[in-house]
Amino acid sequence: MTRLDSVERAVADIAAGKAVIVIDDEDRENEGDLIFAAEKATPEMVAFMVRYTSGYLCVPLDGAICDRLGLLPMYAVNQDKHGTAYTVTVDARNGVGTGISASDRATTMRLLADPTSIAEDFTRPGHVVPLRAKDGGVLRRPGHTEAAVDLARMAGLQPAGAICEIVSQKDEGSMAQTDELRVFADEHDLAMITIADLIEWRRKHEKHIERIAEARIPTRHGEFRAIGYTSIYEEVEHVALVRGEIAGPNSDGDDVLVRVHSECLTGDVFGSRRCDCGPQLDAAMAMVAREGRGIVLYMRGHEGRGIGLMHKLQAYQLQDAGEDTVDANLKLGLPADARDYGIGAQILVDLGVRSMRLLTNNPAKRVGLDGYGLHIIERVPLPVRTNAENIRYLMTKRDKMGHDLAGLDDFHESVHLPGEFGGAL
């Protein structure tokens, strides 16, 4: 595996006026961009970028800057396959020659990043290509445009960067790939990170949730407080069903019984027997109700282990044709499990949880939450409900995904009546 540097180093280098290399996903452009902060642009930095890249220098900007400077889309209907939001090209109106030299382009870059600049400070068209970044940065769109703006903002600078794709020194008709980029980074003392690293860092270190509403919800397992949250950048709503006092005058947020439940429309609502999701949700609510204190966190956007409802139905088609639940996802070009628990972890922290007993049969869920500073003192298994429709699915989860599911080899049709785990408590 190619060695990468820390996001912290990359941010520090951006703040110091240095360039960094950012690599995107191999299934996307699979390229490395040279990136620096636009307000730190110098003729030497631009000349270095021109020498080792394609020379098509772009300046990613946040939406507010684009609006202030009147930077309209280059074309009304964006047909770029990655949705890169090119705007009209510009040059600085004053202090430049033709606009193409390294010195001229550095001047234009700095002016684009200047919070006092106005639309009339630029001529159109020009030799620098502004790009409009998505609000929310790499959490909304995992592109180099957003990475550049995020890095500049994280460095305490204006949300404006400069980017260009690095060309291979072995084959100048191609772009440099990961191994060659590492060599290049070492030769020039440049930090190298991935967009995935940046996404992970932001999820872990920034707050991305907002508490919206709270209401009393009477259920057949008793009464819960339903606390609603929105995920700011993903436009997804989540609900925490809370029983008892989690943290307050009589509770310290420790030893909380918690279930983090991934949304499953087919299992939770329709009662599908293809999975065990509905019974797990029911059992978790009953166990928390019996405990008298705990949380069932219902995570929206996790449908089909994060691949979405339509893809899940397509995966079901492949399973009916003989694939298992893991291979069906992979055959669709999707990960076996695409869920991220960062938002869930932030919600639990907001609710006052410090340590928990986690209701799950999935050890990976424990790892996913542990990484966000929550202390998991115990993994509490959930009852397994088997039937002829879900036994193969459960065996695949056990054998390929490491779920702790005992007794499947002794399968016989399980019969469970409604309310088995406690009824109305």
Swiss-Prot record:
Pathway per the UniProt entry: Cofactor biosynthesis; riboflavin biosynthesis; 2-hydroxy-3-oxobutyl phosphate from D-ribulose 5-phosphate: step 1/1; Cofactor biosynthesis; riboflavin biosynthesis; 5-amino-6-(D-ribitylamino)uracil from GTP: step 1/4
Binding of GTP, residues: 259-263, 280, 303-305, 325, 360, 365
Gene responsible for this protein: ribBA
Transmembrane intervals: none
Details of cofactor binding: Binds 2 divalent metal cations per subunit. Magnesium or manganese.
Family matches, as InterPro entries: DHBP_synth_RibB-like_a/b_dom (IPR017945), DHBP_synthase_RibB (IPR000422), GTP_cyclohydro_II (IPR032677), RibA (IPR000926), RibA-like_sf (IPR036144), Riboflavin_synth_RibBA (IPR016299)
Species assigned in the record: Mycolicibacterium paratuberculosis (strain ATCC BAA-968 / K-10) (Mycobacterium paratuberculosis)
Protein name (record): Riboflavin biosynthesis protein RibBA
Function in brief: Catalyzes the conversion of D-ribulose 5-phosphate to formate and 3,4-dihydroxy-2-butanone 4-phosphate. Catalyzes the conversion of GTP to 2,5-diamino-6-ribosylamino-4(3H)-pyrimidinone 5'-phosphate (DARP), formate and pyrophosphate.
Region listing for DHBP synthase, in residue ranges: 1-204
UniProt binding sites for Mg(2+) 1: 29
